[in-house]
A protein has these predicted regions:
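Conserved hydrophobic/aromatic beta-strand scaffold that supports enzyme active sites
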Residues: 19, 28-30, 51, 68, ...
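A short, N-terminal "cap"/entry segment at the start of jelly-roll beta-barrel domains
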Residues: 1-43
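Short strand-connecting beta-turns/loops that link adjacent beta-strands
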Residues: 25, 66, 92-94
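Flexible, glycine-rich phosphate/dinucleotide-binding loops
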Residues: 37, 60, 107
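Tight coil/turn sites that cap or link beta-strands
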Residues: 36-37, 73-74, 80-82
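A short beta-strand-loop-beta hairpin characteristic of the jelly-roll/cupin
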Residues: 45-46, 51-73, 88
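Ligand-binding loop in jelly-roll beta-barrel domains
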Residues: 82-107
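Short, acidic/polar N-cap/turn motifs at the starts of alpha helices
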Residues: 16-18, 58, 84
């Protein structure tokens, strides 16, 4: 049976995105981050709303309005569609395990 916390022995050089469920209006994925960040000159500007929970590790997010958020295991947030944001830090030990839900969550 799949386990959200189970990690393979390989070391990830890139963030790993694993689709768990995908439907007509929703996508649920697990993301494994091992120190990766968003390019400082780039922003995510997603078409869909995103609800995300950090299940393990620590991370820092930044928004286009200069808001900064520090996340620890168990913290979650809702990022509305077209809200510019980026990941500025993800812990390596422990690795970050995220659960993200993408969809039209406000409509």
């Amino acid at each position: 049976m799949p386990n959200i916390y189970e990690l393979s022995q390989e070391v990830y050089q890139l963030e790993k995105f694993e689709q768990i469920v995908s439907g007509k209006n929703i996508q649920i994925e697990r993301i494994i981050s091992t120190g990766q960040t968003t390019n400082p000159r780039e922003w995510y500007d997603q078409e869909l709303d995103e609800w995300v929970i950090l299940l393990q590790g620590e991370a820092d997010l930044a928004y286009g309005d200069d808001t900064r958020i520090k996340l620890k295991a168990g913290d979650y947030l809702l990022i509305p569609a077209h809200t510019k944001h980026r990941v500025e830090y993800t812990s390596i030990e422990p690795v970050c395990i995220w659960l993200a839900v993408h969809g039209q969550l406000f409509h």
